[in-house]
């Protein structure tokens, strides 16, 4: 029996996909499944998303794109992080769309002797991370337009402040993106399918849906903007089996450095999840776990393999083997856990690693 598990609810994934498909309306729905489907397991999750309405998939790396083809995904797949030095020809041969994120990437594709290459141009509209810069637009557009083996399917960009719906930076980026799109079309690139909406923009700015939307986090049932609810169902639960319960005397400490000491005689329990499994060491004293509907605070330093919780005088009789929910079903949700750790729910669902075993329900 596994001591540490992430339970993935595939029915929740299916439900979320249907909700997002309906919200997308006439726009195509691209599912972002990078980072092993946000740590939910792409081999199980992607087929469910495909079966319930996704028109396309987006990933970061070539390996992720190839994996989608290996598991039978037939929809369009867009890969946006690759280098000209990589063997990207194999991806082209498997009908994977490649992002043009710089003039060097454009040149590498233009110089490739493939018969047909589908590309999408990524525009840097203000995030200043990756994407073709404004001073490079004209040169890249004209070069791609002159390459007969290149099919430019569209353009996309990434929004810096979409999780702040009132931030004017989003509209400034959209103005820049539309300027790039107009220039591309002036150079003869039709760019029929364009997209700017990640999860927060998709859920809060229907005026920006364009021809396709590109949510990621929302597929896994998490809300990207605080205070906004869209009927999504969280798919991940991170839980562990209590390994031992022991008595502790008043004044005694626990874990390295004895940074926490019991005020009264009582009990502590050990939960086998440590920083080797994705539980951050700096989480000391910031969160609680839920056992049979009761919250118990984490105390002392988080160790490599385990952390400690205080049971008080253990009125509910917690014993070894009890299920401790770190976040998810019957416990605090991932967003609450993230807030306690001063981070975001995107990171939290990517944390369970190490000896955590994924189980599907």
UniProtKB/Swiss-Prot annotation:
Its EC number is 5.1.1.1. SMART domains: Ala_racemase_C (SM01005). Substrate binds at residues 129, 304. Transmembrane segments: none annotated. GO terms for molecular function: alanine racemase activity; pyridoxal phosphate binding. GO terms for biological process: D-alanine biosynthetic process; peptidoglycan biosynthetic process. Its cofactor is pyridoxal 5'-phosphate. Keywords: Isomerase, Pyridoxal phosphate. The modification N6-(pyridoxal phosphate)lysine is found at residue 34. InterPro entries: Ala_racemase, Ala_racemase/Decarboxylase_C, Ala_racemase_C, Ala_racemase_N, PLP-binding_barrel. Pathway: Amino-acid biosynthesis; D-alanine biosynthesis; D-alanine from L-alanine: step 1/1. CDD domains: PLPDE_III_AR (cd00430). Coiled coil: none annotated. Pfam families: Ala_racemase_C, Ala_racemase_N. Catalyzes the interconversion of L-alanine and D-alanine. May also act on other amino acids. This is Alanine racemase. It comes from Corynebacterium glutamicum (strain R). The gene is alr.
